[in-house]
């Protein structure tokens, strides 16, 4: 028994030595961790200036882009107008070469004098004055028939009825319907209307959307008119307004979808605000000047 106990003690002692060895190895692992942390810090320090350089390069690119964007509209303001085409709905730049200079009294109002509220009020005034007010409905007394009592007052079990033209019945009269005595028009001062007209013309002139051109046709033909608009490079616009007294232009332009031909007397503020291009003759310009004066 004593020998067996000695053997067991001998076997236990090397286990203690192994624990000491493991304890001695443990700090080496900690050292490796600290070295790895130091290496990572060095890599971050090396990588930081690169990221800063990339940021600087990005900022420089943005500044170049903004400068190029700001410089574009300054060039186009004087000569071009951006309009949506009717076929592709894409913006197009159109250059109008006017041989006649537009008078400043009509087309040169300052930004302070341009009044959008006057434009809005005048459009409402024009729409209200276009309403004729001829709508009408018939009351139970105006509808034909219905003089006979449909059934007797008592004994049928039905509700009482005195006429088949009662508003409750199908085919009867209408209660509180519209009558032609109503008027929708209202008044606006002449100064406000003139201000709206001039401000809408100046807005078109600021966009360079006014072209002074004497259109003439040999015969009534929509194809010839379209060819002339193609020569002016405005045939694909959504809305073109031509001011002319010529009957040939008026009749040949009725078949064109995006074209509206109007006399100078019937030119309205709403039409001026809807159009993308306005065609005027020299004669109409002189008449406009005389009216304003």
From Swiss-Prot:
Protein name: Large ribosomal subunit protein uL4
Disulfide partners: none
Protein role: One of the primary rRNA binding proteins, this protein initially binds near the 5'-end of the 23S rRNA. It is important during the early stages of 50S assembly. It makes multiple contacts with different domains of the 23S rRNA in the assembled 50S subunit and ribosome. Forms part of the polypeptide exit tunnel.
GO (cellular component) term, any one: ribonucleoprotein complex
Gene Ontology BP annotations: translation
Organism: Mycoplasma mobile (strain ATCC 43663 / 163K / NCTC 11711)
A molecular function (GO) term: rRNA binding
UniProt cross-references to HAMAP family, sorted A to Z: Ribosomal_uL4_B
A Pfam family per the record: Ribosomal_L4
Region listing for Disordered, in residue ranges: 1-72, 130-166
Keywords recorded for this protein, A-Z: Ribonucleoprotein, Ribosomal protein, RNA-binding, rRNA-binding
InterPro entries documented for this protein: Ribosomal_uL4, Ribosomal_uL4-like, Ribosomal_uL4_dom_sf
Subunit structure: Part of the 50S ribosomal subunit.
Positions with biased composition (Basic and acidic residues): 1-14, 33-55
Family: Belongs to the universal ribosomal protein uL4 family.
């Amino acid at each position: 028994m004593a020998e067996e106990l000695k053997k067991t003690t001998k076997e236990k002692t090397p286990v203690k030595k192994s624990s000491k060895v493991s304890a001695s190895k443990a700090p080496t692992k900690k050292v490796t961790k600290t070295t790895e942390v130091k290496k990572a810090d060095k890599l971050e320090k090396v990588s930081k200036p690169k990221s800063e350089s990339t940021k600087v390069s990005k900022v420089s690119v943005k500044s170049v882009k903004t400068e190029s964007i700001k410089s574009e509209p300054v060039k186009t303001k004087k000569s071009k107008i951006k309009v949506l085409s009717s076929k592709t709905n894409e913006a197009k730049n159109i250059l109008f070469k006017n041989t006649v200079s537009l008078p400043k009294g009509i087309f040169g109002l300052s930004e302070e004098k341009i009044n959008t509220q006057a434009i809005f009020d005048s459009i409402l005034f024009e729409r209200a004055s276009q309403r004729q007010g001829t709508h009408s409905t018939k009351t139970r007394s105006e509808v034909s028939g219905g003089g006979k009592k449909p059934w007797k007052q008592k004994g049928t079990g039905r509700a009482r009825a005195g006429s088949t033209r009662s508003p409750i019945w199908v085919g009867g009269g209408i209660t509180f319907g519209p009558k032609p005595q109503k008027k929708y028009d209202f008044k606006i001062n002449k100064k406000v209307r003139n201000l709206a007209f001039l401000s809408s013309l100046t807005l078109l002139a600021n966009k360079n959307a006014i072209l002074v051109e004497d259109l003439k046709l040999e015969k009534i033909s929509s194809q010839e008119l379209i060819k002339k608009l193609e020569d002016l490079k405005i045939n694909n616009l959504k809305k073109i307004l031509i001011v002319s007294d010529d009957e040939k232009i008026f009749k040949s332009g009725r078949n064109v979808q995006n074209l509206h031909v109007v006399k100078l007397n019937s030119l309205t503020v709403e039409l001026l605000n809807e159009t993308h291009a306005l065609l005027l003759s020299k004669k109409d310009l002189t008449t406009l000047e005389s009216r304003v004066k």
